Amino acid sequence: MTYLQEASRNAITVPKLQAMRDAGEKIAMLTCYDASFAALLDRAGVDVLLIGDSLGNVLQGQTTTLPVSLADIAYHTASVARARPAALIVADLPFGTYGTPEDAFRSSVELMRAGAQMVKLEGGEWLADTVRFLVERSIPVCAHVGLTPQSVHAFGGFKVQGKTEAGATQLMRDSLAVQQAGAQLIVMEAIPTLLASDVTKQLRIPTIGIGAGLDCSGQVLVLHDMLGIFPGKRPRFVKDFMHGQPSILAAVEAYVAAVKDGSFPGPEHTF
């Protein structure tokens, strides 16, 4: 089966992402939930595959990511890992699985055993001790700041973050704190472009934007969104790369090319 073939390019590792950032090469990231798509995305040149808790929305039909369990993420991580992609495999820690450093470690071990090479946690300054605890135990960490979907009820909906002076200051503090704690990657979601640019300049680690402007070290989208598979209104930061393309592979290749050459996101995709 094609999804069990060995990857034909050099592996993307955590140090490789840092080298890409330092060299000014943009990082293309997409969500992925199964072996077949893992093989296709890898063939298209995607650098990072994220087993996101967004699977709750796009696979399970949930209205939020909160119902997604650790077992759900582990199952889909194992499915992606079986494709043996060259792309780095990052797995989300779901809501309620990292309340303490010890909880986060136990949850991360399960995902790493399933095939993850890095785990992603939502939170900033308050999460620094947990990030440090994981990194000290050889678990690479991606932090997620800005609009963190697991906090949807605390935010009162899916709203742009960092728009006020206080909010921007806190987001900068959050980003610096998780970097200082040892995070090797950070996702910034739905924040003003200028703020994302400032944070990217202040940090030494790669920043991955989703609705955070062009100046981030890379971009991420939910796979279904960039293929035009979204019920209802299209999110502002999403572009339908499937439109006008002859195949899914061509659409993903177009996404990778647009991220790499800086043509995505455009002003219409940012805040």
Swiss-Prot record:
Q: Which UniProt keywords apply?
A: Cytoplasm, Magnesium, Metal-binding, Pantothenate biosynthesis, Transferase
- Per the UniProt entry, what is one GO biological process? pantothenate biosynthetic process
The record's InterPro entries line, in alphabetical order, gives: Pantoate_hydroxy_MeTrfase, Pyrv/PenolPyrv_kinase-like_dom, Pyrv_kinase-like_dom_sf
Cofactors named for this entry: Mg(2+)
Top enzyme class, one word, equals transferase
- Gene Ontology MF terms: 3-methyl-2-oxobutanoate hydroxymethyltransferase activity; magnesium ion binding
A GO CC annotation given for this chain: cytoplasm
Subcellular location(s): the record lists: Cytoplasm
Question: Might you give the EC number(s) for this enzyme?
Answer: 2.1.2.11
The pathway to which it is assigned is:
Cofactor biosynthesis; (R)-pantothenate biosynthesis; (R)-pantoate from 3-methyl-2-oxobutanoate: step 1/2
- For the ligand (3-methyl-2-oxobutanoate), the binding residues are D53, S54, D92, K120
What remark does the entry make about the cofactor? Binds 1 Mg(2+) ion per subunit.
Residues involved in Mg(2+) binding: D53, D92, E122
Per the Swiss-Prot or TrEMBL record, the active site comprises E189 (proton acceptor)
Q: What is its main location?
A: cytoplasm
Reaction(s) catalysed by this chain, per the record, are:
3-methyl-2-oxobutanoate + (6R)-5,10-methylene-5,6,7,8-tetrahydrofolate + H2O = 2-dehydropantoate + (6S)-5,6,7,8-tetrahydrofolate
Q: What does this protein do?
A: Catalyzes the reversible reaction in which hydroxymethyl group from 5,10-methylenetetrahydrofolate is transferred onto alpha-ketoisovalerate to form ketopantoate.
| Protein family (similarity comment) | Belongs to the PanB family.
Q: Which NCBIfam families match?
A: panB, PRK00311.1
**Assembly behavior:** Homodecamer; pentamer of dimers.
Name of this protein: 3-methyl-2-oxobutanoate hydroxymethyltransferase
Biological source species: Paraburkholderia phytofirmans (strain DSM 17436 / LMG 22146 / PsJN) (Burkholderia phytofirmans)
What lineage does UniProt assign to this protein's organism?
Answer: Bacteria, Pseudomonadati, Pseudomonadota, Betaproteobacteria, Burkholderiales
